[in-house]
A protein has these predicted regions:
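Multi-pass membrane proteins that catalyze or facilitate reactions on polyprenyl-/lipid-phosphate substrates
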Residues: 2-22, 31-301
Length: 301
């Protein structure tokens, strides 16, 4: 596909959207990729980083390597994600701390609309897709109610966290950030981003690179050979994840971060008890943002 500067600028903006979603525990950058119409190309491009393409790189055929991995596309997306993560990490963590109901309400509407958006691409609901959907809902719901673990902070475990979290990040409905919460490393990694802890970030990114290049092959195969079933699972993931992004929560357990700030560790959903009108408005905004992004992506194709 021939693309111009305008196209790559748009791709970078889509990457910014993915990065913003990935910073929020409970929301997936993969969901945004699906909404803006780049999911399949993203998975296929990542999958193309393999032995064959790496051979081109190490034999000095860099132009052929870049073309083989759809490099212009990937660098645009990665640049957008990086800009978003490094610029929004402080803002998102502040909003989640000081205005949690508003943030979760917006993303609740966004994820709810995304569930419809992905689900409508399922061509047929049958004895294979319905169980796949139910399994997706159950797995995602279980993940959202799991208790965060106390884990080590050595570099090998940080590497594993990168490999595991990135797989979740490219799955619509499964939040890489929330996987980091369960692994006990969300605020640790956010702190590394804010302070630019280069060693921690490089080890985490190394794990992410290994994880995403491996998992993308599995996902690409599933989408090409079992698309309806795969989409049913992904739709289930998103519906099940709504439990995590419900705006009204009660804190059951807390922890103190490295700056002495008390933050929630385990939360339970409760009935709406504050900011109800504002939250409903933000849910509607999040819902229609997905609709707008879908229409915009369709017009720009």
């Amino acid at each position: 596909m021939e693309r111009g500067l305008k196209d790559y600028a748009l791709l970078m903006l889509k990457g910014v959207g993915m990065g913003a979603a990935d910073v929020v525990p409970g929301v997936s950058g993969g969901t945004i990729a699906f909404i803006v119409g780049i999911y399949d190309e993203l998975i296929d491009s990542i999958k193309s980083i393999n032995g064959k393409s790496l051979k081109l790189f190490f034999t000095g055929k860099w132009g052929a390597f870049w073309k083989a991995i759809n490099g212009n596309f990937l660098i645009s997306i990665v640049a957008g994600i990086a800009v978003s993560v490094f610029s929004l990490a402080k803002v998102i963590t502040w909003l989640l701390t000081d205005h949690p109901v508003m943030v979760w309400a917006f993303f609740f509407g966004l994820v709810l609309a995304s569930t419809w958006f992905v689900g409508k691409d399922i061509k047929e609901w049958n004895k294979k897709t319905i169980p796949a959907f139910i399994i997706g809902v159950a797995v995602a719901y279980y993940i959202t109610v799991a208790t965060p673990a106390e884990t080590p902070s050595n570099l090998f475990f940080i590497f594993l966290c990168g490999a595991i979290a990135i797989c979740a990040m490219i799955l619509p409905g499964i939040s890489g950030s929330f996987i980091l919460v369960l692994l006990g490393k969300y605020f640790y990694i956010m702190e590394a981003v804010k302070t630019f802890d280069i060693v921690t970030l490089l080890v985490f990114l190394a794990g992410a690179c290994i994880g995403i290049t491996t998992f993308s092959r599995v996902l690409s195969y599933a989408l090409k050979n079992f698309r309806n079933i795969t989409l049913a699972v992904l739709t289930g993931f998103m519906l099940g994840s709504l439990n995590k992004v419900w705006p009204w929560k009660e804190t059951l357990e807390t922890f103190t971060d490295s700056h002495g700030v008390v933050k929630p560790l385990v939360e339970a959903n409760i009935l709406p008890n504050q900011y109800i009108v504002e939250a409903v408005v933000l849910m509607i905004v999040g819902f229609f943002l997905v609709y707008f992004l879908e229409k915009l992506s369709t017009c720009l194709l």
